Amino acid sequence: MELMKLEIVTPNGVIFDDDVKQVTLPGSEGEFGVLPKHATLVSLLDTGVIVIEKADGSEVAVAINSGYVKVDEEKTTCIVDGAVALSGEDSDLAKALEEAKELIKKAESSSVAIASAVSKVEQIGKSF
């Protein structure tokens, strides 16, 4: 099983740094997936949710408000203005979901992108 390194960095520090199977990113032109050995690219990230499939097959979601991504064959680096990890115990998850909704609503993005991101965060909340 091939893995790649994924790093998500905010102005406050690194919030995710691990090997993953794949990641789905909210690009400025729509969502796109990245697998190990992906072609090199740099792209804008829009308000939305990063969905990560970890090495053990579990999924983790991180809500972001905007940023950039640099992809190469072995590593994907997301540099974002703000991010909230949507995982943890039930009480922590409820707080994280509220923080994620606030983060997304503060983004200077189109209302369609914000509504889509909030909807995705709410769906994640229902699945836990």
Curated annotation (Swiss-Prot):
Q: Name one GO cellular component term.
A: proton-transporting ATP synthase complex
List the InterPro entries hit by this protein, alphabetically. ATP_synth_F1_dsu/esu, ATP_synth_F1_dsu/esu_N, ATPsynth_dsu/esu_N
- Give the record's membrane topology: Peripheral membrane protein
Entries under Gene3D superfamilies matching the protein: F0F1 ATP synthase delta/epsilon subunit, N-terminal (2.60.15.10)
Q: Where in the cell is it found?
A: Cell inner membrane
Keywords, A to Z?
A: ATP synthesis, Cell inner membrane, Cell membrane, CF(1), Hydrogen ion transport, Ion transport, Membrane, Transport
The primary location reported for this protein is: membrane
Instruction: Output the Gene Ontology terms for molecular function.
Output: ATP binding; proton-transporting ATP synthase activity, rotational mechanism
So which domain of life are we looking at?
Bacteria
Q: Which Cys residues form disulphide pairs?
A: none
Say what the protein does.
Produces ATP from ADP in the presence of a proton gradient across the membrane.
Subunit description:
F-type ATPases have 2 components, CF(1) - the catalytic core - and CF(0) - the membrane proton channel. CF(1) has five subunits: alpha(3), beta(3), gamma(1), delta(1), epsilon(1). CF(0) has three main subunits: a, b and c.
- Report the sequence similarity comment from the record: Belongs to the ATPase epsilon chain family.
In terms of NCBIfam families, this protein maps to: ATP_synt_epsi (TIGR01216)
Q: Write the protein's name.
A: ATP synthase epsilon chain
Q: What is the lineage of its organism?
A: Bacteria, Pseudomonadati, Campylobacterota, Epsilonproteobacteria, Campylobacterales
